[in-house]
């Protein structure tokens, strides 16, 4: 049997590889503390689960759902955006529920790119932006994110011959993996740049509700003209501890939303209706869970930053997101340092190069680790310092 070239050329997904390494270590009876994957360990709030249980017993929710989501869910999503960001959305034309935002991100390339087009993709970045673009037959032009520019892309440095073929610009703030944030002035620059060069902007914003020290991230759609040029992907996964329930949204430009809707309707059957109803409970109910989450993650951030500094690493505490982006010691590469930590301490981190070539020299640590495990990891890191 011969597989398609697109599959033959598809690299293994980064986090699948990491999970395999962890499983191998644990199968040998070794203790492993993993800071590798950003999957909240905190439970879904009880009032949200109660709505799911209630909805699951209703036979009307046992049938095929509507691909574009329940009207009442789209309305709840639009109202949440209005309350949170002051952004007004038409729930019928500018809101599309997704089976997790990753699904929409993966589909976007097929909606907005043809073979030979160019996608402008930050580097380092969540791997799906580049992989989905390549699967759709497009070329990827990397936009380096570096500390000197606060991990923001330099749009003016993009060559004209690239811009003439570029169709999509990906951005992501608060950022994964760097933890960087972007203000409204940057989003305004992006909206103006996209309008000038006829680009479709795809902003991935699932970490807007994970922020520290009183910081409040803004939405790309708050920029003037943003809805004319782009959409924003959001997720309930990180905000309400719902990664396992797979529900997110795309909002913004009506033409782009309609393209995603048409694509989805031909490939999937939508989000299970009971999960849509639990999402409504999350969006319409108390938002105190967000404050509670942020307090927990901030405490973890502070402990991890302190421990990394104690072993000689120059770490900046992130203002938002679930990640610490830490430069590795001199004489190490991202991969060699991550490997040494795993071999000598049993602590798993993600090498920065897993997110692109510009991630060289860094590792990423996630805050989605129970406090007890964090303390064990910190003890292991302290032991590493003594032995090195």
Swiss-Prot record:
Root EC class: transferase
Pathway per the UniProt entry: Amino-acid biosynthesis; L-lysine biosynthesis via DAP pathway; LL-2,6-diaminopimelate from (S)-tetrahydrodipicolinate (aminotransferase route): step 1/1
EC number: 2.6.1.83
N6-(pyridoxal phosphate)lysine found at: 238
Catalyzed reactions per annotation: (2S,6S)-2,6-diaminopimelate + 2-oxoglutarate = (S)-2,3,4,5-tetrahydrodipicolinate + L-glutamate + H2O + H(+)
UniProt-annotated binding residues for pyridoxal 5'-phosphate: 101-102, 126, 176, 207, 235-237, 246
PROSITE patterns reported for this sequence: AA_TRANSFER_CLASS_1
UniProt keyword Transferase, yes or no: yes
Necessary cofactors: pyridoxal 5'-phosphate
Top-rank taxon, per record: Bacteria
Annotated residues for binding of substrate: 13, 38, 102, 126, 176, 364
Pfam families noted in UniProt: Aminotran_1_2
Molecular function terms, GO-annotated: L,L-diaminopimelate aminotransferase activity; pyridoxal phosphate binding
GO BP field: lysine biosynthetic process via diaminopimelate, diaminopimelate-aminotransferase pathway
Protein task: Involved in the synthesis of meso-diaminopimelate (m-DAP or DL-DAP), required for both lysine and peptidoglycan biosynthesis. Catalyzes the direct conversion of tetrahydrodipicolinate to LL-diaminopimelate.
PANTHER family membership: AMINO ACID AMINOTRANSFERASE, L-GLUTAMINE--4-(METHYLSULFANYL)-2-OXOBUTANOATE AMINOTRANSFERASE
Protein family: Belongs to the class-I pyridoxal-phosphate-dependent aminotransferase family. LL-diaminopimelate aminotransferase subfamily.
Record's protein name: LL-diaminopimelate aminotransferase
Organism from which the protein derives: Dehalococcoides mccartyi (strain CBDB1)
